Structure formats: C-alpha cells, structure tokens
C-alpha cells in the first residue's frame, strides 16, 4: 500500500517531469519541418538507449536487469514507443497544443483502468477531478474540432497507448529499480526503429540538427526518471489529474519563446488544471 505521506512527493516529482516533457516535444516538432519523422523517432529512442541501457546493466548486473518483471517492462516499453510514435506523427500536421489536448485523454483512461488492472480504489472525487482537469485542458487549448482529421486521430491513439504505459509503469514499479525501469522504456522502440531506419533515411542532417537530435535522448531520460519516481510514491489514479499540468508548462514555453500571452479563458483553464490536482492530493492525504 502507498504511504499517504508520500503522495505530495509523488505529485511534485510528476510536476517536474511534466515541465521537462514539453521541451522534448518542442524539439521534435522543430526538427519535423526538415527531417522525416521516423528519423526523429529513432533519435529519441536510440539516444535514450545508448546513454542509459549499458549503464543500467553495468550498475545492476544481469540479475538486477533481468527479473520477474521483465515481461511487464518490455510491454510498458512497447506502449510508450507506440504512444510516442503516433504523437510525433500527429504534430507534423497539427499544432503541438492541439495534439497534446487529445493525448491528455490518457489520465481519464488511467482512472478507470487502474481499478481493474491495479486494484486501486476509485472515488467520485477522483473522477470529478479528472473531468475538471480535462475541461481545463479544453479551455487552454480551445481546439478547433471542425478541422478534425486523421492526424488528430493519431493523437487520440497516442493517448490510449500512453494510458497503458502509465498503468504498466505503476504495475512494475513495485518490483523494479528506477534505472532498470527507465532503461526498459526505450528498448523496444530503439530495436524496432534501428531495424526500420535504414529503409527510410534520406539525407544527412546538418550539424545544428544533429546537436538538437542529440539533446532529445538526455531530455527524455531526465523527464522519465522523475516520472517513474513519482509513480513509486503515489497511486496511478491519484496522479492522473496531475498530468494536465503538462499543458501549463506547454503554455509557459509558448509565452517565453513565442511571446504568446494566455487569454482569460486560458487562465481559467490553467486554474482548473491546478485545482484538480490539489484537490485530489489533499483528499488522499486526509483520508
């Protein structure tokens, strides 16, 4: 059972991760204007793989790296690969915030599935907070659903795979070390994309593009480390509404780099997002 005193720590760690994640998404979208999306997906997973997997195996040894949760770890890694691939494809044709709003259907799926897969207790407050968070996201994004197309479907599909990744992250964290879990999240994607990329690579990236591609792996490692640690301290259904904080950091990046000042509706949406997370965390701590 998760110690209630650790819930706040789990929420804090997840918020840190969600501040970092949009940076990685922004790098991917920037590169997609000149490079094939498969090259960017390969860089994301191979960079993560080459930096972390050898280190994890060296530190933990064969017994620490291969254990009873290996099957779940690989399944989890496959889900994050599929979710990332569909999301990256979607942002080549639709704005990043719009894609993110569709991806964020995942926390609502987590609240429901955590009851059946993880045997976690769901409450009316958890459901309400998840819905408030989603409503806040729509206020922030104000997506034009009249322009709904196949690339929007890709973003929705990525949300489904991301939800399963969240569930399996919680499932394996009871028996696995953080660095091992972090390593397995890249193995399926790195292997699949390394096998596929020779058939799709067309041109040599510029030095600037290579440097940006090289940053994606480390950024992913840092964000996912905080992400995995968060799920060691709090239930999946408790953390679900907090994932909407990612849109807050997304808006902040837009303000800082693109001088895009939030409207009143966006500000109200941000307050809804933050409120949903605070309410569910305080309720968990006091019950």
Residue spans of the language-model regions?
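Loop-to-transmembrane-helix transition segments
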Residues: 9-15, 56-57, 62-86, 150-158, ...
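Hydrophobic/small/kink-forming positions within alpha-helical transmembrane segments
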Residues: 18-26, 53, 77, 81-85, ...
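Transmembrane alpha-helical segments that form core, pore/gating elements
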Residues: 29, 37-38, 52, 145-205
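Hydrophobic/aromatic residues within transmembrane alpha-helices
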Residues: 31, 40, 44, 90, ...
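Transmembrane alpha-helices of multi-pass small-molecule transport proteins
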Residues: 34-82, 161-164, 184-200
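C-terminal transmembrane-helix exit sites in multi-pass transporters
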Residues: 87, 106-128, 248-267
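Helix-helix packing/entry segments at the starts of transmembrane helices
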Residues: 100-105, 172-188, 224-255
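Hydrophobic transmembrane alpha-helices of multi-pass small-molecule transport proteins
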Residues: 125-141, 265-284
């Amino acid at each position: 059972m998760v110690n209630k005193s650790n819930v706040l720590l789990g929420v804090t760690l997840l918020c840190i991760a969600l501040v970092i994640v949009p940076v990685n998404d922004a790098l991917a979208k920037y590169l997609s204007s000149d490079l094939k999306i498969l090259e960017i997906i390969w860089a994301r997973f191979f960079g993560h793989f080459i930096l972390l997997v050898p280190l994890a195996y060296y530190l933990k040894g064969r017994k620490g790296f291969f254990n009873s949760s290996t099957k779940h770890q690989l399944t989890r890694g496959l889900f994050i690969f599929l979710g990332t691939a569909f999301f990256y494809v979607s942002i080549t044709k639709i704005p990043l915030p719009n894609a993110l709003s569709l991806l964020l259907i995942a926390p609502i799926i987590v609240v429901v599935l955590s009851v059946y897969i993880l045997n976690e207790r769901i409450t009316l407050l958890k459901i309400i907070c998840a819905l408030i968070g989603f409503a806040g996201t729509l206020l922030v994004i104000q997506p034009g659903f009249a322009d709904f197309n196949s690339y929007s479907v890709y973003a929705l599909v990525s949300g489904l795979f991301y939800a399963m990744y969240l569930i399996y992250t919680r499932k394996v964290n009871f028996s696995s070390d953080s660095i091992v879990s972090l390593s397995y999240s890249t193995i399926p994607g790195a292997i699949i994309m390394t096998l596929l990329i020779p058939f799709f690579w067309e041109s040599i990236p510029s030095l600037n593009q290579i440097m940006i591609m090289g940053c994606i792996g480390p950024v992913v490692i840092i964000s996912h480390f905080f992400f995995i640690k968060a799920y060691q301290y709090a239930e999946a259904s408790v953390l679900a509404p907090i994932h909407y904080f990612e849109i807050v950091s997304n808006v902040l990046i837009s303000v800082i780099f693109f001088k895009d000042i939030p409207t009143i509706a966006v500000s109200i949406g941000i307050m809804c997002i933050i409120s949903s997370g605070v309410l569910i965390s305080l309720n968990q701590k006091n019950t």
